[in-house]
């Protein structure tokens, strides 16, 4: 039977839920392709000793991948879930001198004022859709713009609503064109979609249909 609604409910303030989610969401080969793409773009945009901010760092999978391959960068991971930050802190222990953890709600709290500058890149994966609406995503894009150094990059790998989908998608899963329009209106340079992953139109699950969006300040 086809899925009429595509979305998921989370309880990230629960330690038990966060641990279970982290175990289920270990990066697959397909998801690692997204990490590879993000890393490739960051090597062009971030100086060797630059600073990266991750929005919604979750259990630290992307952070671990990047810190392993970028041995001199500083990293700030932001998440509203204390249990997720605890999981990430344990996973990233060997990188501890280079990592700062910040607990904040990306929409309701001025996290950008707590981030050490300059920031050369802001990244996020499978997180901003959980904000629930295009307006909330726009708020985060605006705050990211004010945080980035001139020439800095924003890279968002997140679940999207495919243009040909007939199902109802949760509010934070928006069209690629909507992401690009928002970034353009906020003053970003050259907003674009780098790639789309795990496309499924007939019977999509909540873990399919995601894209990598990028823009510069």
Where do the model's predicted regions map?
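Class I SAM-dependent methyltransferase SAM/SAH-binding core
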Residues: 53, 59-109
């Amino acid at each position: 039977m086809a899925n009429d609604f595509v979305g998921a409910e989370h309880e990230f303030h629960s330690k038990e839920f966060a641990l279970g989610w982290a175990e289920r969401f270990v990066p697959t080969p397909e998801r690692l392709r997204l990490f590879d793409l993000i890393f490739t773009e960051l090597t062009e945009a971030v100086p060797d000793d630059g600073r990266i901010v991750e929005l919604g760092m979750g259990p630290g999978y992307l952070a671990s991948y990047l810190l392993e391959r970028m041995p001199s960068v500083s990293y700030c991971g932001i998440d509203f879930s204390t249990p997720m930050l605890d999981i990430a802190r344990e996973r990233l222990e060997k990188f501890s001198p280079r990592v700062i953890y910040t607990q904040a709600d990306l929409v309701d709290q001025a996290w950008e004022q707590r981030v050490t500058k300059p920031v050369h890149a802001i990244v996020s994966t499978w997180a901003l859709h959980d904000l629930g609406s295009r307006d909330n995503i726009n708020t985060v894009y605006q705050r990211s713009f004010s945080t980035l150094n001139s020439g800095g990059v924003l890279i968002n790998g997140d679940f999207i609503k495919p243009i040909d989908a007939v199902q109802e998608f949760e509010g934070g899963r928006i069209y690629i064109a909507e992401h690009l329009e928002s970034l353009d209106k906020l003053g970003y340079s050259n907003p674009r979609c780098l790639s789309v992953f795990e496309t499924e139109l007939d019977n999509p699950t909540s873990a399919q249909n995601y894209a990598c969006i990028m823009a510069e300040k």
